[in-house]
């Protein structure tokens, strides 16, 4: 989401329970945090541009979300990609199933454009800078782990000129 253009959209899982442990680090090191995106796991980005998004598309997301049980996640480990420090959501199976359902419905849209594998590794970004320079951040976050969360909805975010905004929320099956 770092090179996003106005009108870009994404489908994300919000994880507010991790904010006390990582919020200050995200504000400092995650380029999307200051733009209004809270702690999250990305399901699909980029998705249909806002100007082409239809009610039928949103109905499709609502259908997928409505068939999805709430997802119980535990964040107990920190992972690293080149230039990314992240929390590992476990179990990842329900997230991967959600990614599969969304990409099956919209096969022209792969997570991250297919750049990081299909499907990519589910993760919650803490910092998008060289992780090897973040020893103090890692030590601080490790003290707060594990963190548990129940995710009960999928959120549609849209890139505006001033940052990201929430367009809709699609509740999971209750």
PLM regions: where:
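Conserved TIR/SEFIR loop-to-helix hotspot centered on a Trp-containing motif
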Residues: 78
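Short acidic/glycine-enriched loop/turn segments that link adjacent beta-strands
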Residues: 81-83
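Basic, often amphipathic N-terminal segments
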Residues: 1-72, 92-152, 165-174
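Short beta-strand segments and strand-loop junctions that repeat across beta-rich extracellular domains
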Residues: 152-161
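Short histidine-centered catalytic/ligand-binding loop motif
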Residues: 86-90
């Amino acid at each position: 989401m770092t090179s996003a253009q106005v009108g870009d959209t994404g489908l994300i899982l919000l994880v507010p329970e991790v904010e006390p442990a990582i919020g200050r680090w995200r504000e400092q090191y995650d380029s999307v945090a200051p733009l209004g995106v809270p702690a999250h796991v990305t399901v699909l980005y980029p998705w249909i541009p806002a100007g082409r998004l239809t009610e039928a598309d949103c109905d499709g997301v609502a259908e997928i979300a409505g068939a999805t049980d709430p997802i119980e996640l535990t964040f107990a480990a920190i992972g690293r990609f080149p230039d990314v420090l992240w929390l590992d959501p476990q179990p990842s199976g329900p997230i991967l199933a959600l990614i599969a359902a969304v990409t099956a419905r919209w096969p022209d849209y792969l997570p991250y454009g297919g750049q990081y594998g299909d499907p990519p590794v589910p993760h919650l970004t803490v910092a998008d800078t060289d992780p090897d320079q973040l020893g103090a951040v890692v030590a601080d976050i490790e003290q707060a782990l594990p963190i548990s969360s129940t995710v009960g909805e999928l959120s549609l975010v849209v890139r505006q000129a001033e940052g990201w905004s929430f367009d809709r929320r699609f509740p999971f099956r209750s």
